[in-house]
């Protein structure tokens, strides 16, 4: 006796089961799921894979999304603990990582996250040898270096989310201060995604008018308008959200999806993301930090040679030194 499906549907051609634009998110915590829902709502993928070691949490999050399939334009959502579920991904986003525990140093946390990357990355490489990888796990700059080393990928295919969110916060806060939409406020935060990040005040502008031409003291201690507090708020913004809601998720999820869109759509947009900067701006060590990079279907294809003041370049070098002092003691 024929099944309902056999009576209802007549197949004409065999289905092509290979996805054309598959994205994998590794880690289904708050950040991973914010990335996942942002990607789904933007319709960037024809298949989304979720990977996590916590199978109950993973299944629950996946089912929650699948139950909303009617409202999404992504036809296939898959999940699993094994990395074969991620096979043939165009883009893999790593959000999995350990959280700091009481009494632990940043180096201790970093070493634990290095161990996690050693467990994650080989499975990604084996199943998706041609993918691009975006690292979101903190400390993102050093872990981007770690993933690059473990993966053996060309440097342009291993991208840290870096200061893309810092720069977005920067532009939002400038816009709030000026009463202008942040898309019309142009400015960059470079260097470490963290306390030593560098605001490039010399380039901040609205409609091509640099704020420094209107206020030469902008961003300094002598500035009577206290613009320096804008960068302070950028640095403290994540901690502020963390203290109030226990974690950050939505802004970083949107930021990562913005990077994914530039890569998958080959938009050639410029983003401040983490990449290898050895040999540039006086940096001699094999350090990864954020500089403005062109993102397209090959990953990072170019970077912009930013005109900085001597002070800004000095701060960028100091940021690199901060990262190197942690990175040099790593055991890979």
Swiss-Prot record:
Keyword Methyltransferase appears in the UniProt entry: no
GO molecular-function terms, A-Z: L-lactate dehydrogenase activity
Tissue specificity of this protein: Expressed within the midpiece of sperm tail (at protein level).
Binding, substrate: 106, 138, 169, 248
BP-aspect Gene Ontology terms: ATP biosynthetic process; flagellated sperm motility; lactate biosynthetic process from pyruvate; lactate metabolic process; pyruvate catabolic process
Entry annotation: catalytic residues: 193
Residues where Blocked amino end (Ser) is found: 2
Pathway: Fermentation; pyruvate fermentation to lactate; (S)-lactate from pyruvate: step 1/1
CDD domains found in the cross-reference section: LDH_1 (cd05293)
Positions bound to NAD(+): 29-57, 99, 138
Record-listed E.C. numbers: 1.1.1.27
Subunit structure: Homotetramer. Interacts with RABL2/RABL2A; binds preferentially to GTP-bound RABL2.
Function: Possible role in sperm motility.
Protein name: L-lactate dehydrogenase C chain
Organism name: Mus musculus
Gene: Ldhc
């Amino acid at each position: 006796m024929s099944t309902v499906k056999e009576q209802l549907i007549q197949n004409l051609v065999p289905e092509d089961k290979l996805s054309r634009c598959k994205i994998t998110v590794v880690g289904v915590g708050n950040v991973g799921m914010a990335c996942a829902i942002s990607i789904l709502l933007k319709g960037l993928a024809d298949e989304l894979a979720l990977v996590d070691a916590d199978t109950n949490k993973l299944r629950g999050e996946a089912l929650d999304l699948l139950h909303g399939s009617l409202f999404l334009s992504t036809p296939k959502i898959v999940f699993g603990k094994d990395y074969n579920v991620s096979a043939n991904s165009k883009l893999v986003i790593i959000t999995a990582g350990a959280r700091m525990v009481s009494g632990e140093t940043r180096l201790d946390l970093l070493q634990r996250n290095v161990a996690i990357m050693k467990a994650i990355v080989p499975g990604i490489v084996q199943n998706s040898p041609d993918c691009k990888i975006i690292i979101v796990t903190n400390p993102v700059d050093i872990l981007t270096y770690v993933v690059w080393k473990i993966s053996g990928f060309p440097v342009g295919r291993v991208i840290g989310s870096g200061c893309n969110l810092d720069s977005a916060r920067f532009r939002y806060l400038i816009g709030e201060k000026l009463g202008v939409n942040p898309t019309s406020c142009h400015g960059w935060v470079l260097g470490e995604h963290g306390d030593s990040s560098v605001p490039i005040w010399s380039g901040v502008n609205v409609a091509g008018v640099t704020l420094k031409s209107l206020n030469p003291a902008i961003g300094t201690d002598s500035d009577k308008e206290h613009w320096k507090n804008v960068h302070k708020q950028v640095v403290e913004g994540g901690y502020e959200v963390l203290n109030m809601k226990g974690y950050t998720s939505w802004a970083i999820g949107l930021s990562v999806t913005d990077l994914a869109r530039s890569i998958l759509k080959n938009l050639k947009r410029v983003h401040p993301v983490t990449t290898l900067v050895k040999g540039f701006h006086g940096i001699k060590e094999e350090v990864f930090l954020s500089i403005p990079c062109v993102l397209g279907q090959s990953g990072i294809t170019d970077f912009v040679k930013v005109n900085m003041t001597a002070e800004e370049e000095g701060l960028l070098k100091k940021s690199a030194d901060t990262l190197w002092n942690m990175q040099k003691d790593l055991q890979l």
